[in-house]
Amino acid sequence: MKAVLTGDLIDSTHYELGLLSTILDTLKEELQYLEEVYGCRGWMERGDSLQVLTSEPGRAFQFALLLKAAVNKIGGDEGRKSGRPEADIRLFIGLGEVDMERASLAESAGEAFQLSGRGLDELKRKRINFGIQGPDAGFNAEMDVSCHLLDAVMKKWSIASAEVVYWRFRGLQRQQQIADRLGVLQSSVQRRMEVLGWSAVEAFADRYQLLVQNMQR
């Protein structure tokens, strides 16, 4: 079983060119990071869509939130980091087999690709920005409810929240490490984590990983 993450920028036609350019450069950097560190394959299309293929489906949620936080933290000087992000991305994770993997992800095929692509289209209809689906009906039922709840939490993130999430999923485990990276006090990072609902994010991540492991047995 593999995971395919498909995403597109939300309302990208309304972004100023400078902001859009920064977002695209950022996403390219993050895709390169995922390729170099985790062996993922990343691909961008039309300037506002992306796809990631990973043979570690248990990490797909981590990768999705890394990309989301990378976009959400863009923009905002020190005076407005408590404000809403200037940009956002819609993401869907599809879990399943990959029957044909070609040099171009656009030409690859399989259950994971189908679920991810169809799932992203369904998100637009439901007006939510995050979802997960796999080959198991019980897993899908739980993810549908959980992703709706998590989406509501993530829609309340500020730029400051996204900064913390980003560095947490970039591997900084301790609050002091994140504080040093951001140039703020550890107590500030702690407050940000409380406000963004980190305990809910962490609980979701743990549950997702457990369910994926069970499906792989």
Question: Each PLM stretch: what is its role?
Answer:
Residues 1-217:
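Regulatory and interdomain segments flanking nucleotide-handling catalytic cores
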